[in-house]
Regions:
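Small-residue-enriched hydrophobic alpha-helices in membranes
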Residues: 1-32, 39-148
Length: 148
């Protein structure tokens, strides 16, 4: 996750309720822990994003305690805005690809989250493919502009 860069539109995020912001962060936290644990680097990442989102320290502790997919599914139901749902799926795909390895657990979680928000699997796959294409394009840019 070291090279991860969040690319969300912060003006858009500012318009979300605190519960919706917390739902985003819970989804990020659970996705980061898909391997069975949250590393210190992943915890720091969640805390930094929470600070950027303006989420209280008290809620951050709640976010970091998530240990099952069902809690995430319930939390994301607070996201009742289609654009916010698609944004969350995009950012989850970016996070899942941050280590260049998309696990089955990550794929299943992204699917469950999307479906809970009313996003069909075809749209989730479309977003995931777009993220992959974009990552490839960024890597090619490093080569072209001799930044390797």
């Amino acid at each position: 996750m070291a090279d991860l860069k969040m690319e969300m539109d912060m003006d858009f995020i500012a318009g979300l309720s605190e519960d919706q912001k917390v739902a985003f962060l819970k989804a990020f936290s659970r996705l980061a822990a898909a391997d069975g644990r949250l590393d210190p680097e992943e915890i720091e990442f969640i805390k930094e994003v929470a600070l950027t989102f303006g989420v209280s320290e008290r809620r951050v502790e709640e976010i970091l305690k998530i240990d099952n997919d069902e809690e995430i599914i319930e939390a994301v139901k607070a996201i009742n805005n289609r654009r916010a749902a698609l944004e969350l799926i995009k950012e989850m795909c970016v996070l899942a690809h941050a280590d260049d390895e998309l696990s089955d657990e990550e794929t299943v979680l992204i699917g469950k989250v999307g479906l809970a928000m009313g996003v069909d699997l075809e749209k989730i796959e479309q977003i995931s493919n777009w993220v992959i294409d974009r990552l490839i394009w960024l890597e090619e840019a490093k080569i072209i502009f001799e930044e390797v």
